[in-house]
Amino acid sequence: MKTIRFTQPVKALALALGLFSAVAHAADAPLKVGTTAAFAIPLEAAVEEAGKQGLKVELVEFTDWIAPNVSLAAGDIDVNYFQHIPFLENAKAASGFDLVPFAPGIINNVGLYSKRYKSFAELPEGATVAIANDPINSGRGLQLLAKAGLITLKPGVGYKATEDDIVTNPKKIKILQVEAVQLVRAYDDADLVQGYPAYIRLAKTFDAGSALLFDGLDHKEYVIQFVIQPKEKNDPRLIKFVDIYQHSPAVRAALDKAHGKLYQAGWEG
């Protein structure tokens, strides 16, 4: 298995120099799958299983949540796997990408974590709360704060909630917006942090299951998707790889190891 990891400066230089080709894939060309660290380990298991079945797959790991869609739209990768539909729709609206969900992956729990406090009642007035800074996942963080009873939001705003939609904030909490993949680092400094168990497990700094509150697995809009350009929907390599990801016992074991009980298979209903 071959895994390529791009840092932002390297990606920018490569794109500027035109080092990525946009040629159509050949039948025997490897399927290029873009992802981020949170989802890489189970995908690596799928890549290994695909190899056993004669399918060449190359995993391309990105360090941010912007480059995977840029690279997919440019044709540098064939599919990406890191985002749910609300995030995708926001990216399409912002950048004009012609990208579509192809198949569901997993849905992860997201929680509120605190190093200092054991309950929301213990949070002091003016407590600092770190949530994601992208438009969609910040809305998910605000929904969590509302579920915890720390704020109330305007009716019906859902995942599109912004700080302007906060109606009441009785503890006068101070909201800090941080890049989602960096939220785990805010655990030591903020009083309360929106946390993604997959990144917490990777960081190995605290227990991913120790959240004061999880958002539950009932919001299907947050299922992570395999995303493609529409023209690739009949690519047999893609169809086979997704089938392996969804049904291989080896991949399921890797998912269980990576996410514990804090995920659900989105293709299972």
Predicted regions and their residues:
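Beta->alpha turn/N-cap motifs
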Residues: E61-W65, G75, V79-E89, I106, ...
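Periplasmic-binding protein-like
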Residues: N137-A146, Y245-G266
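Short helix-initiation/N-cap motifs at beta->coil->alpha
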Residues: L59-V70, V157-R185
